[in-house]
Each structure stands twice: as C-alpha cells, then as structure tokens.
Amino acid sequence: MKQIQVDLGVRSYPIIFSQNLMSCGEHFARYLQDKNILIVTNETIAPLYLEKLQTVLSSFNCVAPVILPDGEQYKTLEQMDSIFTSLLQQNLGRDTVLIALGGGVVGDMTGFAAASYQRGIDFIQVPTTLLAQVDSSVGGKTAVNHPLGKNMIGAFYQPKMVMIDIDCLNTLPPREFSAGMAEVIKYGIIWDAEFFKWLEDNIEQLKSLDAQALTYAIGRCCEIKAEVVARDETEQGVRALLNLGHTFGHAIEAEMGYGVWLHGEAVAAGTVLAANTASGMDLIDESIVCRIIKLFEAFDLPVSPPNSMNFEDFIRHMRRDKKVLKGQLRLVLPEAIGQAGIYCEVSDELLETVIRCA
C-alpha cells in the first residue's frame, strides 16, 4: 500500500492506493467509529462493488445507500436532492459520514452534499474510474452542473480520505479508461516532462492494465495534484494550471449535451486546441503539438472538436468559464512539455483560426 498526504493544515488527509484495498476495512476505521455511514453510488457501480464495500463495513453502522443514475447528464441539483432526502428520511445528523463510491460524478455530488448538509458533514472518496482516481477525487472540488455551464454550482470541501483500489480499473470500460488517460497526460504536459516521456514509453503497459504501470501513473498524478492543492487550495493561482484543455472542453460538453462526450474526451480535444493556440502565439513549436496529439491518439482519444461546433458556439460557453476575470477570458496554455501558463490576452481572431482549422 502506498500513501500520499495532501497537506492542508487541520484539513490534511491521506490518499491511499494499492490493489485489493476495498477488502481492507481497517483503512476506514478511524473515520467511521461511532458514525452513521451513507454510501452514495450509481446504477453501474452498485452491482459491482456496493455489496463488497458493505460487507467490509459490516461492523459499522451503515444505513440504506443512495443509488444514483449513471452519467454526466444526471449531475444536477435535482439528482443531488435524493441524497438530502435520504439523509433526512433516515434522521441522520452531523455524526454521519458519506462515502462516494464511483466516478467523478458520484464524487462531486457526494462531496457537495457533504459540504451542504447541516452546513457540513464528513465524506470519504472511493473512486472507481481512472479519471476520478487521478483527478476529481483529490483536492476538494465539489459541484453539480447547470444547463448554462459545467460545475457552476459547488464548493471547495475536502474529504477525510481518498481510498484508491486499482483493481476497480479491471471493470472499467475501455472508453472510460481512455477518458481517464486524458487527465493523466495533462499532468505531464503542465508539470512533469519526465512523466510525459514515461507515458510515451509505457503506452502498451498502461493499455493492458499492468498493475505496476498503473500504480506508478496514478501515484505520480496524485503526487502532483497533492502538491498543487497544498500550494493553492481554492484556485487563486497555480491550481488553475490543472484546467489545461478544460475551457475548450467544458464548451464541448455543454454544447453537445452532458454525457455525449465523456469529460476526458472533451479535455483531450480541448488540450489540442490549447496547444494549437500556444503554437499560434509562438509559445511552443509544432513538434510539441505533434507529441501531444500522438499521445492522445495512442489512447484512442479525440484530438479535434465536433464538426458541428463553430467559433461562436465555443466562445458563447467559454465566456461563462469560471476562470473569466473582469470579463476577460483566461486560458491555460502549454509553454513546453512539463510547463504551462495562464494567458489573458488571446485574440478572438487567433481562437477563431485555431477552431476553424481544427
């Protein structure tokens, strides 16, 4: 078992990861003693792992779980209300711990419910998708979507623990695995050139779900995320770099309809748009763009946006991006493999050219 600490003072917490972790109840003990426990999961994950987790936690006071529909299109206030209703109907108070068993949607909704219910209760992340394991479960971003924008309603609220069972990836559909790899690749682009090169050299090992390769990749991503969050918890500075590709990507998700493109797919296409924008500003040369595209393609990820989207479609959604400051669009752009920056003065003319030529 490996452990990484997210250092946030009194709100610090561990990320633990290994194979077969979900069979080990002792990792939960310190957080669940004398607590009521409500597991939140979805219709896809429940048949795979709910009973297993309930069995491991049988010595604790687990109440009836909440099983949500599966998909980004259900990441709404309406669906989150079912968590609140369950808490209230079961007369659960502040001595309750929520456990998010699932991917990013389950984790985001459970975390936001924990932040909101009775002004804050504890929660634990048990991410079952690659994307959630390397990104969304760590750092305390919790939210639901709005028809006008992704993750627009939410809070920063840290979990008590993140427990990553790498064996969960054995039941992950290939398309979902590829979507998670988009976020893995992102870390190499913005932070760690050696890690990017390692990914280029270990494509087949990762695609075959080699446990050693997955353990290293997930661990490195969590190390980077923990370091960034410790330096900038509420995204006032360096944490914004983690949004590489997301401004374009969120526009794709919102325009196409949540769930049509997986989040990681939209991030991959958005990252290529960001790389081409950086190339157009002479921040990087074309060889770097080609390396980024080649690595995304190796994991069967899209490298261009939907044909149906034009510049006007993108810019309408991008103007609502959470990084917009005083009405000015701010884009995360690569400056090299392993380095990125935030840019405010990107002309509409360049963006239109990049999108039109994609």
UniProtKB/Swiss-Prot annotation:
Main location: cytoplasm
Binding site for NAD(+): 70-75, 104-108, 128-129, 141, 150, 168-171
UniProt keyword annotation of Zinc present: yes
A Gene Ontology term for the protein's cellular component: cytoplasm
TM region positions: none
Biological processes, Gene Ontology terms: amino acid biosynthetic process; aromatic amino acid family biosynthetic process; chorismate biosynthetic process
Pathway assigned in UniProt: Metabolic intermediate biosynthesis; chorismate biosynthesis; chorismate from D-erythrose 4-phosphate and phosphoenolpyruvate: step 2/7
Classification via InterPro entries: Dehydroquinate_synthase, DHQ_synth_AroB, DHQ_synth_fam, DHQS/DOIS_N, DHQS_C
Catalytic activity, EC: 4.2.3.4
Family annotation (SUPFAM superfamilies): Dehydroquinate synthase-like
GO molecular function: 3-dehydroquinate synthase activity; metal ion binding; nucleotide binding
Recorded superkingdom: Bacteria
Named cofactor requirement(s): Co(2+); Zn(2+); NAD(+)
Subcellular location: Cytoplasm
Summary of the function given for this chain in its UniProt record: Catalyzes the conversion of 3-deoxy-D-arabino-heptulosonate 7-phosphate (DAHP) to dehydroquinate (DHQ).
Family designation: Belongs to the sugar phosphate cyclases superfamily. Dehydroquinate synthase family.
The protein's name: 3-dehydroquinate synthase
Organism classification: Bacteria, Pseudomonadati, Pseudomonadota, Gammaproteobacteria, Alteromonadales
